[in-house]
Every structure is written in C-alpha cells, then in structure tokens.
Amino acid sequence: MPKMKTKSSAKKRFKVTGSGKIKRKHAFKSHILTKKSKKRKLALTHSALVHKTDEKSIKQQLRII
C-alpha cells in the first residue's frame, strides 16, 4: 500500500513545534487594514497555538498520528 499524502492546505497553514504543539497564523490581516488599529494589527501578526480540541484533526491531516 502506498504512503498516505498529507493535506497540502494543512501543510501550508500549520507548523509543529519541538514539543509537539501546532502553531497557526491569525486571520483578518490581509486587507481592509485602514480601520484596524496599530495595536490590533500588531497582535494579529504574532502566531498562536491551535486549540487542543482541533489538534487531533490537524495532526491527522498532517499525518502525524
């Protein structure tokens, strides 16, 4: 049986840290930025961790499990 392919969309959106947690980027940072404050845009720049309820499905898409 051939190897399972990872989901390309998940591969582009998520990175796994050394401890096994999954990092993601924030949404709402691509356009219509004039009405958003500098503080809000700066906060959206930083990466965040995926919530634990979503970790299992993302790991399946990345073929980690």
Swiss-Prot record:
<dbReference type="GO" id="GO:0022625">
    <property type="term" value="C:cytosolic large ribosomal subunit"/>
</dbReference>
<dbReference type="InterPro" id="IPR001706">
    <property type="entry name" value="Ribosomal_bL35"/>
</dbReference>
<protein>
    <recommendedName>
        <fullName>Large ribosomal subunit protein bL35</fullName>
    </recommendedName>
</protein>
<dbReference type="GO" id="GO:0003735">
    <property type="term" value="F:structural constituent of ribosome"/>
</dbReference>
<comment type="similarity">
    <text>Belongs to the bacterial ribosomal protein bL35 family.</text>
</comment>
<dbReference type="InterPro" id="IPR021137">
    <property type="entry name" value="Ribosomal_bL35-like"/>
</dbReference>
<dbReference type="GO" id="GO:0006412">
    <property type="term" value="P:translation"/>
</dbReference>
<keyword id="KW-0689">Ribosomal protein</keyword>
<dbReference type="Pfam" id="PF01632">
    <property type="entry name" value="Ribosomal_L35p"/>
</dbReference>
<feature type="region of interest" description="Disordered">
    <location>
        <begin position="1"/>
        <end position="22"/>
    </location>
</feature>
<keyword id="KW-0687">Ribonucleoprotein</keyword>
<dbReference type="InterPro" id="IPR018265">
    <property type="entry name" value="Ribosomal_bL35_CS"/>
</dbReference>
<dbReference type="InterPro" id="IPR037229">
    <property type="entry name" value="Ribosomal_bL35_sf"/>
</dbReference>
